[in-house]
Amino acid sequence: SSAASYLYKRQFFSCTQNQKVDTVSLFNGNNLDGWIIYGTEKWYVDNNELVCESGPDKQYGYLGTQDNFDDFILQLKFKQENNGNSGVFFRSTVDGTKVKGWQVEVAPPGFHSGGIYESYGRGWLVKPQSSKDSIVKMGEWNDMKIKVKGDEVTTWINDTEMIKIKDSIIGKGIGGVALQIHDGGGIKVRWKDLKIQKL
């Protein structure tokens, strides 16, 4: 029996070692290493937090990862200091200030945070139920989790599942992660603890 027990333990440990998670911090808390700024809006580090703020041009702006990410779980915290529209893009590419890909909405309560919007394409693919409008807390830190695997996307805000969607076009998407400043001005959002686990 001791031989069988040893074999079981060996198989168990080899299985757990193979499943070792590869989690990467996307933001080092000091500078924008690993990111690319698109547009003229403001991206900077303050108090070890990543801040996006509308500039005088009041145009779209993006901060995108240098690396592409295919299947992953992204976790982050965001705090909205002003009204305004932001978002987290996945499997996306940016050319100038035109983005191709999919956005997980980050907006004030009542404006579909956690929903999926396809820019320059089909528009809204899915919005959370209106009963979830009050999940986002303005002026406070909110937890967001985004899981992208194959053609399926699930989003959570403050541990509440916001949406789940299966979409063949998303399944074919290739690109990185990007944070957005919407046009129109008046936007200021803080971000921290951006961590991505490759699946």
Give the ranges of each region predicted by the language model.
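Short, small-residue-biased leader/transition segments that mark boundaries at the very start
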Residues: 1-11
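Carbohydrate-interacting regions of secretory-pathway proteins
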Residues: 15-199
